From Swiss-Prot:
Function (record text): Connects cell membrane constituents to the actin cytoskeleton. May promote orthogonal branching of actin filaments and links actin filaments to membrane glycoproteins. Anchors various transmembrane proteins to the actin cytoskeleton.
Taxonomy of the source species: Eukaryota, Metazoa, Chordata, Craniata, Vertebrata
Protein name per the record: Filamin-B
Gene: FLNB
PTM comment, free text: ISGylation prevents ability to interact with the upstream activators of the JNK cascade and inhibits IFNA-induced JNK signaling. Ubiquitination by a SCF-like complex containing ASB2 leads to proteasomal degradation which promotes muscle differentiation.
Organism the protein comes from: Oryctolagus cuniculus (Rabbit)
Chain intervals for the UniProt region annotation (Self-association site, tail): 164-294
């Protein structure tokens, strides 16, 4: 409460959260000369409240109010990030990485990706924190900044990801920035025990695939496609390429995170090829694929 000793005028208040956001607040008169400032905090940590009367701070303003237990504020030093998407990727293909906030208490997460193209960015909650997905459209170096609970970077941030592949957008400015902000809630690591439930055994019908390499290829050039086994339980991915006479020179499979595989292959001659993609013993939907090399 604030006392004004009978002076007439306007009281107004502003609440600043630890991350610098201005929170909405309501000033109400409890009785003549006594006011209450109410706000709903979205972050733990020290909030600063400016209370002004006719534009000047009242005695004691700005007030400091702690929300949550000490040490419970979103502490960026306790947040970690990992995953292939922090190191690199390919244009037009979604890269992803994970952010673990279980040790940090609630805070606002901000992810900024700066590089040669805008990226389509998406974020999903996971039991441990967040999964961030982004699709770069031009090759080059991207700086990925991850901040938590305010203006401070988490450990290792900014990360530098090297993206290869063709440029899929017209030349833009040299530096494009994309960012997302997520208001986090408390996550305790006890939630992670759910991920220990054994996954249903294998189901090849749940594997999906996409990419030009499933239908066409060119002599001496890399063809690629993406296979997503994330919903198919546990098994191994087997790839075979069968050509007219010469064996396929090179077939490589790279796990790009959470059971998604990027497969590339190079063919040596023209003709009809058969491409088999199996999850354990069973063909995935669409397999065997027929690939024509002109």
């Amino acid at each position: 409460g604030t006392r004004l000793n009978g002076a007439k005028g306007k009281i107004d208040a502003k609440v600043h959260s630890p991350s610098g956001a201005v929170e909405e607040c309501h000033v109400s008169e409890l009785e003549p000369d006594k006011y209450a400032v109410r706000f709903i905090p979205h972050e733990n940590g020290i909030h600063t409240i400016d209370v002004k009367f006719n534009g000047s701070h009242v005695v004691g303003s700005p007030f400091k109010v702690r929300v949550g237990e000490p040490g419970q504020a979103g502490n960026p030093a306790l947040v970690s990030a990992y995953g292939a998407g922090l190191e690199g990727g390919t244009t037009g293909i979604q890269s992803e990485f994970f952010i673990n906030t279980t040790r940090a208490g609630p805070g606002t997460l901000s992810v900024t990706i700066e590089g040669p193209s805008k990226v389509k960015m998406d974020c999903q909650e996971t039991p441990e924190g967040y999964k961030v997905m982004y699709t770069p459209m031009a090759p080059g170096n991207y700086l990925i900044g991850v901040k938590y609970g305010g203006p401070n970077h988490i450990v290792g941030s900014p990360f530098k990801a090297k993206v290869t592949g063709q440029r899929l957008v017209g030349p833009g400015s040299t530096n494009e920035t994309s960012s997302i902000l997520v208001e986090s809630v408390t996550r305790s690591s006890t939630e992670t025990c759910y991920s220990a439930i054994p996954k249903a055994s294998s189901d090849a019908s749940k594997v999906t695939s996409k990419g030009a390499g499933l239908s066409k290829a060119f002599v001496g050039q890399k063809s690629s496609f993406l296979v997503d086994c994330s919903k198919a339980g546990s098994n191994m991915l087997l790839i075979g390429v069968h050509g007219p006479t010469t064996p396929c020179e090179e077939v490589s499979m790279k796990h790009v995170g959470s059971q998604q595989y990027n497969v590339t292959y190079v063919v040596k001659e023209r003709g009809e090829y058969v491409l088999a993609v199996k999850w354990g013993e069973e063909h995935i939907p669409g397999s065997p694929f027929h690939v024509t090399v002109p």
